[in-house]
Amino acid sequence: PELISKISSFGLGDYSLNQAGVAAAIASYNDEKFLRYSKEKIVEARDMLLDAVKENGLKPLTTSTNFMFVDLGSLNAEAFRKEMEKEKVLVRGIYQDYVNWSRVSTGKIADVKQYIKALPKVLDKIS
């Protein structure tokens, strides 16, 4: 109880927000240079993904986010997910009734390159 009281004294408000965590969040929010860098990398990665998806005959949904949905045509999204996982690439499998749609996040450029490398191999395997 004494230790819990001591630790609790560093919280903020009813939600027990940690002061150090709040300070870090505010600093991150105000770091405009990092925000610009992050946005640039998201756009770069998204463009790489869009090109790769189209080059492999798939149809991406238009997006302005850090992820995209890809229409796999007649291919099953869960089979695609499992094969991509074997290639050390994590993507979203089937979501609700969308059995032929895959969701991929931008991630780091190295991760995007891994997706691009694995994509044709996996498509050949499950086609």
Whereabouts are the PLM-identified features?
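PLP-dependent aminotransferase class I/II
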Residues: 1-53, 58-61
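A generic structural signal for alpha-helix starts
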Residues: 2, 33, 75-76, 110
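Short, solvent-exposed alpha-helical surface patches in well-structured domains
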Residues: 5-6, 79, 114
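Conserved PLP-binding catalytic core of the aspartate aminotransferase-like
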Residues: 42-47, 51-87, 106
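Conserved alpha/beta core of the MobA/IspD/sugar-nucleotide pyrophosphorylase nucleotidyltransferase superfamily
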Residues: 63-65, 70, 95-98, 111
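PLP-dependent enzyme catalytic core of the Aspartate aminotransferase-like
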Residues: 82-87, 96-127
